[in-house]
Swiss-Prot record:
Recorded name of the encoding gene: nop58
Compositionally biased spans, kind Acidic residues: 477-491
Stretches assigned to the Nop domain: 285-417
Summary of the function given for this chain in its UniProt record: Required for pre-18S rRNA processing. May bind microtubules.
Source species of the chain: Botryotinia fuckeliana (strain B05.10) (Noble rot fungus)
UniProt-recorded name of the protein: Nucleolar protein 58
Biased composition (Basic and acidic residues): 492-540
Region annotation Disordered: where it falls in the sequence: 451-568
């Protein structure tokens, strides 16, 4: 009889069983394989090929789920080339079609309801069918493989977890508030004992370290602070300690102050470590956004939107005003102008712009950031996604952000009227090139102005130079000159180039004033003409009324004459 081979994939490896083909013709297959003894009597293990690692298991199972024949499965099926008229039971019909297309195999793939019953029995009694395989090992391997397969289907990557960004930036803000509170409390507390040190040492971390190393003020002169402070500041502190006006404190007070100083030092070091961690995570999750707006602003945008995907789905107009919702709704309610920027205002590119150009640069930056966000959120830079042997490097991932930032910088320099820099030159937050550090120079300090002091006794006041005021020409005189002959105009035009720029500007201003005066005079003349016309119109009805009265009187006289004639 022709044999029947059963292909089963497990979390441990690929298994090939051999059985009689009559097994498929039985009606009570499900009842026969319910027990381990029954299924062991029907099936015999032909070959078991283990997975070398979890990555190999994921790759093999993923290809089987997609209905593809992997190289490992092909090598397993090569052992069945010599079998004639044999059948192969598979769980997936799609996989059976792919196996049927393999060259050199004469196997007939089978996948129906009876084979499903057989596979169900194999899964239930797998430890008894494969010697040396414990149930605990199978459950552990199945759990790990299922998680890996789920991540593969979702294309999940631990480097893409933006929840870490949201938590890190929130914790960073909280740390800043706590550090400011603790540092202020340390300075106020230790200031009772050594108040002069607060004016000399401005850095909170250095202040706390000095407290931990010096302790009481009397120990300042004998303590070496070279590893904490520069030499000149150390000298100033030691000199101030000799003449300090602070009060004395007990050892218990100092112990509590030192405990608080240790908190300041610990929080400061942790904040630095958290800041570097946040920068690394932002570079891994959103490299293009980081290049455009920076790691802190980018992290705040992601935290405000909730996730990287939500931010990538937002249009550029939303990204531009993200963080200014109160101002936006207030403007919409009062029908005023809407805000031009929100959190993006703190980006270095917007800070380089001045005045009215801030809104333009914020709009351009938001548009480029929207494109970069979609690349960061939706692109698959892994080796598996790209089909390459190695992962894509950081420069290639952030190439879009670098080129977009360079375009915005060039556009900004054009708007500001600054000379365009050659490509590849870095620009600092102040808008200047940072390719080469400038030479440090000592500038002259502002000197004391003794003339600004008050005068005592009969001391003479300092002489103040008085500027001579030049007499401006009157408007009437300019008007007369403008109405002169053409010969005078030609003479003036010949003289203008010989005068300085200031005199030419004054002449232009005087001419403009004359034009304004002429326009005003013309307007007044028009008004006077209109007033005369209105007066004539008001006199016209009176003249017409007198004419009518005269005609009426003449008519009455003629009627009286006619009556007299009729009487006669």
């Amino acid at each position: 009889m022709a044999p029947l081979f059963i292909l089963t994939e497990t979390a441990a490896g690929l298994v090939l069983f051999k059985a009689d083909k009559k097994l498929l013709k039985k009606d009570d297959v499900a009842s026969e394989i319910e027990t381990a003894e029954g299924i062991n009597g029907l099936l015999k293990l032909k070959q078991f090929q283990k997975f070398d690692s979890a990555a190999t298991a994921l790759e093999e199972v993923a290809s089987l789920v997609e209905g593809k024949v992997s190289p490992m499965l092909a090598s397993l099926l090569d052992t069945l080339k010599d079998e004639k008229k044999a059948s192969l039971a598979v769980a997936d019909p799609k996989l059976g079609q792919a196996i049927n297309k393999l060259p050199g195999l004469t196997l007939t793939p089978i996948s129906d309801s009876k084979t499903n019953d057989i596979f169900r029995g194999i899964r239930d009694h797998l430890p008894s069918l494969i010697p040396g395989l414990l149930p605990e090992h199978i459950s552990t391997m199945s759990l790990g493989l299922s998680h890996s397969l789920s991540r593969h289907k979702l294309k999940f990557s631990p480097d893409k977890v933006d929840t870490m960004i949201v938590q890190a930036i929130s914790l960073l803000d909280d740390l800043d508030k706590e550090l400011n509170t603790y540092a202020m409390r340390v300075k106020e507390w230790y200031g009772w004992h050594f108040p002069e040190m607060g004016k000399i040492v401005n850095d909170n971390l250095a202040y706390a370290r000095v407290i931990l190393k010096v302790g009481m003020r009397v120990n300042t002169s004998s303590t070496d602070l070279a590893d904490i402070l520069p030499e000149e500041i150390e000298t100033a502190i030691k000199a101030a300690a000799e003449v300090s006006m602070g009060t004395e404190i007990t050892q218990e007070d100092l112990d509590n102050i030192k405990l608080l100083a240790e908190q300041v030092v610990g929080f400061t070091e942790y904040r630095q470590q958290l800041s570097s961690y946040l920068s690394a995570r932002m570079q891994a999750i959103a490299p293009n956004l980081t290049e455009l707006v920076g790691d802190l602003v980018g992290a705040r945008l992601i935290a405000h939107a909730g996730s990287l995907m939500n931010l990538a789905k937002s249009p550029a107009s939303t990204i531009q005003i993200l963080g200014a919702e109160k101002a936006l709704f207030r403007a919409l309610k009062t029908k005023h102008d809407t805000p031009k920027y929100g959190l993006i205002y703190h980006a270095s590119l917007v800070g380089q712009a001045t005045g009215k150009n801030k809104g333009k640069i914020a709009r351009m930056l938001a548009a480029k950031a929207a494109i970069g966000l979609r690349v960061d959120a939706l692109s698959d830079w892994s080796a598996q996604g790209e089909g390459k042997g190695d992962d894509v490097d950081d420069e290639e991932r952030s190439a879009l952000g670098v080129t977009s930032r360079a375009k915005i910088e060039r556009h900004l320099r054009g708007l500001e009227g600054k000379p365009l820099l050659p490509r590849g030159v870095a620009v600092g937050p102040n808008g200047k090139a940072t390719s080469a550090p400038g030479k440090w120079e000592v500038k002259e300090a502002r000197k004391y102005n003794a003339d600004a002091d008050g005068l005592a006794g009969d001391e003479p006041a300092a002489a103040v130079p008085i500027r001579e005021k030049k007499n401006k020409k009157l408007i009437e005189e300019v008007a007369e000159e403008s109405g002169s002959d053409s010969s005078d105009d030609s003479d003036a035009s010949e003289k203008k180039p010989k005068k300085g720029d200031k005199e030419a500007k004054k002449a232009e201003k005087a001419a403009k004033k004359a034009e304004k005066a002429a326009k005003k005079a013309a307007k007044e003349a028009k008004k006077a003409a209109k007033a005369e016309k209105e007066a004539k119109k008001s006199d016209a009805p009176e003249v017409n009324g007198s004419k009518k009265r005269k005609s009426e009187d003449d008519g009455e006289k003629s009627e009286k004459k006619k009556k007299k004639k009729s009487k006669d």
